[in-house]
Amino acid sequence: MGLADRTVRKMNSAFDGEDYGSEDGLIFCETEADARERLSRSAGKVLLVSDETACSAFAAIASHPRALSVVFDGDCLPLFSMPDGVSYVLASGGSEVLHAARYFAEVRGIGCTVYPALATLEGAYELKGTLQLGGERTQVPLAECSVVCDVQRLKGAFARGYARLLLTRLANFETRALSAFGIGQGAEPLPSFPETGEEDILRENANARLRERFAPVGEGATLAKLLDACGKPVPEWQAYLQLTSLYAAFFEKGKPRRYFTPDYRARAERAGTDYNLAGVPTAEEYVFRAMALERVRARFAREALSFVKEREAHCEKLSAWEQVSLHGGDLTFLKRLPEYEPHGLSAVIRDFGLMEWEL
């Protein structure tokens, strides 16, 4: 099934007969030109939402008499103080800004176009998001939107976009491995790695984000977000390095520590998570997984080791956009990943007593 077949497209009266770009659902255009055109075609006021890093995207149209500009500060609630008559919303920035604009569009029943600042296209395709609304974070529905990619503005983001595709492939491996342990439904292996042209990377990320509406995202995405929150450069690449090393070591030579029980409560306290969500396996589940490991070890070890062998070539490609290395960096979040993703492959490794190394 092609990307266009999975794209849910919402037409809005503000732009009757709106052009949704190429058949894969993405529009490739300069931000200024596209935003100016949408503003000129709007029947009412247009809300421009951006974060501090992307506010220049709308500089050319911000002074238009029908434009209302907002710099998003992390709380979505102030958006709803906008006056009546807003008929469309344009958003530029990271995933949270795009989520905020799409939630506003969903509540107001208006159209929305987003200009992602990340080549991962996170924020553009999710069906739901978690946003700060006043004093608490709440899961909210998100409107469908048009997605416009300005390749020139994204020039500094393609390393992360490429690395996110690596995590998508790793998530597919993780899903199949978990299925072998009796967890989840499994998945078909993904086809060969895509071309590395910049538009190819954007199209593949759009495809992946759409698949993730109904398929596991993988614990690599969670690890990347944890690393990103700490300001780590190209966090998707660091997450990929760490997890490929972990998976390869586990399937190649990991042996369950038969009489060792992880201190689940202490691990949850260190991670700041809820102990009740740890997902502790029953004795029967543990035995089944230990037996399954020996049955599938060789097959998954070969695939995991192939990921490790390919890292040098990927590192070279990534360095064309941003200098990266083969050093995985700080492993603190990797060690605590089972507490953040209790249904991931690292949790199975933890349950075997193999996530207790010293930092």
Task: Give names to the regions the model predicted.
Residues 188-307:
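Active-site segments that bind and position negatively charged phosphate/pyrophosphate groups
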